[in-house]
Amino acid sequence: VSLAPSGQWRIIALFFTHALAAGTIHTRIPDLQLQIGLSEAQLGLVLIGQPLGALSVFLFSSAIIERFGPRRVILWLLPLVVCTAALATLLLHPIAFFVLLAINGIGFSLSNIAVNVEADRVEAATGGRIMNTCHGAWSIGFLLTSLVGAVLRGLDVAPAIHLWGMAPLLIALLLWVALPMPAMPPRPHAGEKGSKLAIPTLATLG
């Protein structure tokens, strides 16, 4: 599958969209803390849910992306990130918040790996070097979504209005960017396939 250089903007825009979706909830965590009535210690425990969810799928991420393809993983799981953020404004309970953050972390982790795999495949197919540009676009997107959240907090816009208002816009943007993208072939790698599960070394464990 070939991709014209002019079409590389879609993968760059996908990184931007991913950052917009991933960052929406972060500026509203203080508001959700107040609405749920969490102490600082309780909030710290609840926030463990997101990295716990993200780490739980790392061992399986390669197999999942290989099985379904990065584009499909992105189209399925980035909306999950958006929807779990919005649902956190309705299910105002510590356990519900923890579970939603864990699911959010799973969606973020897999979609984040998937967009990077897709960018690598685009580079291999086109011979271009776009990874740095992609990560630059991601940084701009995360900064923008943080600024939007800060402005809306300053205007006393409720988290529910903010996150539910952003959800259809972000999903529509994702579909507009990602649906027309062709399925890129995997980058060819030399050598035999190794074990799909690597045992951590002492250096890895610290």
Per-range role (PLM):
Residues 2-34, 102-103, 198-206:
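Pair of pore-lining "gating" transmembrane helices in MFS-fold secondary transporters
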Residues 15, 44-51:
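Short hydrophobic/aromatic, small-residue-rich stretches within specific transmembrane helices
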Residues 50-52, 139-144:
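Short hydrophobic/small-residue motifs within alpha-helical transmembrane segments
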Residues 56-70, 153:
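Helix-to-loop junctions at the C-terminal end of transmembrane segments
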Residues 72-87, 167:
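Structural signature of the two symmetry-related core transmembrane helices
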Residues 89-100:
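Helix-loop junctions at membrane interfaces in 12-TM secondary transporters
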Residues 109-125:
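Intracellular juxtamembrane helix-capping segments at the cytosolic ends
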Residues 161-179, 203-206:
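Symmetry-related core transmembrane helices of the 12-TM Major Facilitator Superfamily/SLC fold
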